[in-house]
């Protein structure tokens, strides 16, 4: 395809997103109030617990096989690289702009955590449906393209999503140090703090020399081993609370695990996946539910952007203009350039296959705006809500340009 045709193909999904976002924006107006704060919160819960797991489960089970899984091994690595490079760029923005301490975690999160859900889910099908598109047959393009996107979403939820929350809560540090200290205490078998009182109370008795029989010695050693295991158990529980393992296994993650099991085990796959599968109705129902994820998330985005446009939110925000510019430069210039260097370098080293669609999805992960769930997190933690709304307003306003220019360049690069 010519460069102009690639540009038109890239602009169509952006226009679709803008149209649906404008509907959400209108529904969130005070005069309409169909998508107010409470409505967005409830709709977000439906997306989190119903739509997203259905989408990931149906798309991933349909496209994953042993061969495709081996071919896509670099996908979760690439997602982790976007997080690491974005975190580094966010740290550089903090060093240069010197924002208030309570906003540092938010800035790092906005630079590190990209929208690997809504945007690729809209962009890939729209490009695949384009007549004479750069990725060949539209049906195969959409099937495998959506498989790539859902796998990247799964990797995002598992390896990045909770890390991003920890960045936000701890302002970029604290949690990792706590994990390190707890781990060192377990490995070194140091005493638990709750035992210090009993140690101090028995200090005088420990100075007395006592003759202990061999049986008593063995019994004392057994008790010591039990105490040691109890200590290790306490440390493991403490670490699990820090990492919040329950939240890592979110509905979308559980759906992805089930989808992988169904897709990789041939008897289960033949029962559910395929036009002649006896339980095809399960796959069709999940697909029908999953199709509601994209418009619902985009409507929520439109409602959240309204908050950033209100003067009261802008005035109450402590975010400097230099911080906003730093986030924009990091996300829309430095991160995509880093992605081009990494993905093309991986291709030269035979770490990535030559399939254009696969490389395009890998590159697209570096060019998307910040994740929309950051706004939900600020509401949950009750801090940085106004600042997050302002950042989202600017980043998603410029995303119309970024998600047209960069995908055009990516398609030209890989085809």
UniProtKB/Swiss-Prot annotation:
A Pfam family annotated for this UniProt entry: Mem_trans
Topological relation to the membrane, as annotated: Multi-pass membrane protein
Induction details: Up-regulated by auxin application.
Stretches in topological domain Cytoplasmic: 35-44, 97-106, 162-244, 307-322, 377-389
Topology feature Lumenal, residues: 1-13, 62-75, 128-143, 266-285, 344-355, 411-415
Annotated keywords: Auxin signaling pathway, Endoplasmic reticulum, Membrane, Transmembrane, Transmembrane helix, Transport
Superkingdom of this protein's organism: Eukaryota
Subcellular localization(s) per the UniProt record: Endoplasmic reticulum membrane
Family: Belongs to the auxin efflux carrier (TC 2.A.69.2) family.
Name of the protein in question: Protein PIN-LIKES 4
Species of the source: Arabidopsis thaliana
């Amino acid at each position: 395809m010519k460069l102009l045709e690639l540009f038109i193909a890239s602009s169509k999904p952006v226009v679709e997103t803008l149209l649906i976002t404008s509907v959400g924006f209108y529904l969130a107006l005070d005069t309409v109030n169909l998508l107010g704060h409470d409505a967005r919160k409830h709709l977000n819960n439906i997306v989190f617990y119903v739509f997203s797991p259905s989408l990931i489960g149906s798309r991933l089970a349909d496209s994953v096989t042993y061969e495709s899984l081996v071919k896509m091994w670099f996908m979760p690595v690439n997602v982790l690289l976007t997080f690491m490079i974005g975190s580094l760029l966010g740290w550089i923005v903090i060093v240069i702009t010197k924002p208030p301490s309570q906003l540092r975690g938010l800035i790092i999160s906005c630079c590190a955590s990209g929208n690997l859900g809504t945007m690729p889910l809209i962009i890939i099908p729209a490009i695949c449906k384009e007549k004479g598109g750069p990725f060949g047959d539209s049906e195969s393009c959409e099937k495998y393209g959506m498989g790539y996107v859902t796998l990247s979403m799964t990797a995002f939820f598992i390896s990045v999503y909770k890390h991003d929350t920890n960045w936000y809560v701890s302002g970029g540090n604290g949690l990792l140090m706590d994990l390190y200290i707890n781990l060192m205490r377990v490995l070194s078998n140091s005493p638990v703090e709750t035992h210090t009182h009993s140690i101090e109370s028995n200090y005088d008795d420990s100075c007395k020399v006592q003759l202990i029989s061999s049986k008593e010695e063995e019994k004392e050693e057994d008790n010591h081993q039990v105490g040691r295991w109890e200590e290790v158990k306490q440390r493991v529980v403490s670490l699990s609370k820090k990492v919040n393992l329950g939240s890592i296994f979110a509905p979308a993650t559980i759906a992805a695990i089930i989808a992988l099991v169904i897709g990789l085990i041939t008897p289960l796959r033949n029962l559910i996946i395929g036009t002649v599968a006896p339980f095809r109705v399960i796959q069709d129902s999940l697909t029908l539910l999953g199709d509601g994820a994209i418009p619902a998330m985009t409507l929520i985005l439109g409602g959240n952007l309204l908050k950033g446009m209100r003067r009261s939110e802008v005035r109450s925000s402590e975010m400097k203009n230099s911080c906003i510019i730093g986030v924009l430069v990091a996300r829309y210039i430095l991160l995509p350039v880093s992605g081009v260097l990494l993905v093309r370098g991986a291709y030269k080293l035979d770490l990535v296959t030559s399939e254009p669609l696969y490389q395009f999805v890998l590159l697209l992960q570096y060019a998307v705006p910040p994740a929309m769930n950051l706004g939900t997190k600020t509401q949950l933690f009750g801090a940085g809500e106004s600042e997050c709304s302002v950042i989202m307003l600017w980043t998603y306003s410029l995303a119309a340009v970024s998600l047209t220019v960069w995908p055009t360049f990516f398609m030209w690069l890989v085809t």
